[in-house]
A protein has these predicted regions:
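Catalytic pocket-lining loop regions of alpha/beta-barrel enzymes
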Residues: 93-94, 107-215
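Mid-to-C-terminal alpha-helical segments outside catalytic/metal-binding sites
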Residues: 2-8, 17-35, 208-215, 223-258
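Acidic-and-aromatic substrate-binding clefts and catalytic sites of carbohydrate-active enzymes
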Residues: 12-19, 43-51, 73-81, 101-109, ...
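Divalent metal-dependent hydrolysis catalytic cores, especially in the metallo-beta-lactamase
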Residues: 6-7, 11, 22-45, 67-72, ...
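Active-site neighborhood of phospho(di)ester-bond hydrolases with catalytic His/Asp-centered motifs
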Residues: 1-4, 37-40, 70-72, 96, ...
Length: 258
């Protein structure tokens, strides 16, 4: 099992403890995880993601047996198709996109083009609902939470597999029950922001949408890695044997983009 939602790097406007890849490697070993898809946190606020992607690949180079890059591809930026091709050829675990930070509405044609391209290649597209609770956000972090409309629109783009991180129960249900069965199968969620006891939102979702719709994500170093483990450990006994999906199985490269 891998952590699909880890980061290196710090906020561009706030100190963040332990943003280094060597620390992440030790944390994964402690948690018994095989590896991680790793994003470069500052890239969400970069107008041009190329510098952040370069920093990400350089930082992860000594740890590529454990850490796979999750670079950003911005589809309204010149040459994004070439960027997608290059980062896939370099072994990226998934592609990250931040439509809320880029001011893209749910039915943005360029965002859909990125989803279609990821589906054709066979690389998952990762969307982040939030980095922090609204009450904790820095005044310079003005992007709102990802909406269910964004996820539904992208889930209908060809064969793309979506990984949505940071969602709560409300957004997940609003999205899931508005999709066809085939679309539901191509959307996976982490549960780092889904409540366990006493609300038992995760147990409810395991029973209704299915454990196989979930992947493991910690959001390190933004959140403690123990949160996700505790969510699973606190499930009712009859649900603990229901297996979640290993995010690695979602990456099935069909062809190299041209």
């Amino acid at each position: 099992m891998i952590d699909c939602a880890a980061f290196i790097g710090s906020y561009p406007f706030r100190h963040l403890p332990h943003p280094d890849p060597d620390v992440l490697v030790r944390v994964l070993a402690r948690e018994g995880l095989d590896g991680a898809w790793v994003g470069y946190l500052p890239s969400a606020w970069h107008r041009d993601p190329s510098g952040g992607n370069a920093a990400l690949f350089d930082a992860l180079a000594p740890h590529r047996s454990v850490l796979d890059p999750a670079p950003v591809v911005r589809p309204d930026w010149p040459g994004w198709e070439r960027t997608l091709r290059d980062v896939v050829e370099q072994g990226s675990g998934c592609i990250r996109a931040y439509p809320m930070h880029w001011g893209m509405p749910p039915h943005d044609a360029q965002l859909r083009a990125l989803a279609l391209a990821c589906g054709e290649i066979g690389v998952p597209l990762m969307l982040t609902v939030r980095f922090e609770d609204l009450r904790q956000r820095h005044p310079l972090d003005v992007a709102g939470d990802l909406t269910a409309a964004h996820v539904r629109a992208l889930a209908r783009a060809g064969r793309v597999r979506l990984v949505v991180t940071g969602a709560g129960r409300d957004l997940l249900e609003e999205t899931h029950w508005g999709l066809t069965t085939d679309e539901q199968r191509r959307v996976h969620w982490d549960f780092a922001w889904i409540w366990g006891p006493p609300e038992d939102h995760l147990a409810h979702l395991f029973r209704t949408v299915g454990a196989e719709r979930f992947v493991y994500g910690t959001h390190w170093p933004l959140r403690l890695t123990q949160n996700s483990r505790a969510n699973l450990d606190l499930l009712p006994t009859e649900l603990r044997e229901h297996g979640i999906t290993d995010a690695r199985s979602l990456r099935a490269i069909r062809k190299t983009p041209t």
